Amino acid sequence: MYAVFQSGGKQHRVSEGQTVRLEKLDIATGEAVEFAEVLMIANGEEIKIGVPFVEGGVIKAEVVAHGRGEKVKIVKFRRRKHYRKQQGHRQWFTDVKITGISA
């Protein structure tokens, strides 16, 4: 059984017991979270597709950890003008473990 849901403007395909990295959620580590924006649920041959969301579809998860991703460097450069700017960015994320999928 697997499902597709959206969180943080992105869509994720998950199955029960899987750990997923999402955009930062303001929920403490160890707490439970439910995602109601379920786009699709598949259970063997049976597939439910939402318009836009599956009615009654809920994905339950537990927050495992918070952290920051790898550093991305942004560089602005003008040749022959002695001009160079560098900037770095690290995006916050939340790891969640999927505990249940229900329709």
From Swiss-Prot:
InterPro entries in alphabetical order: bL21-like (IPR028909), bL21-like_sf (IPR036164), Ribosomal_bL21 (IPR001787), Ribosomal_bL21_CS (IPR018258)
Any single GO BP term: translation
GO cellular component, one term: ribosome
PROSITE patterns (UniProt xref): RIBOSOMAL_L21 (PS01169)
The encoding gene: rplU
Family annotation (PANTHER family): 50S RIBOSOMAL PROTEIN L21, LARGE RIBOSOMAL SUBUNIT PROTEIN BL21M
Record key words, sorted: Ribonucleoprotein, Ribosomal protein, RNA-binding, rRNA-binding
UniProt GO MF annotations: rRNA binding; structural constituent of ribosome
NCBIfam families according to UniProt: L21
Organism placement in taxonomy: Bacteria, Pseudomonadati, Pseudomonadota, Gammaproteobacteria, Enterobacterales
Protein name: Large ribosomal subunit protein bL21
Family according to the record: Belongs to the bacterial ribosomal protein bL21 family.
The protein's role, per its UniProt record: This protein binds to 23S rRNA in the presence of protein L20.
Quaternary structure and partners: Part of the 50S ribosomal subunit. Contacts protein L20.
Organism per entry: Klebsiella pneumoniae subsp. pneumoniae (strain ATCC 700721 / MGH 78578)
Transmembrane annotation, as ranges: none
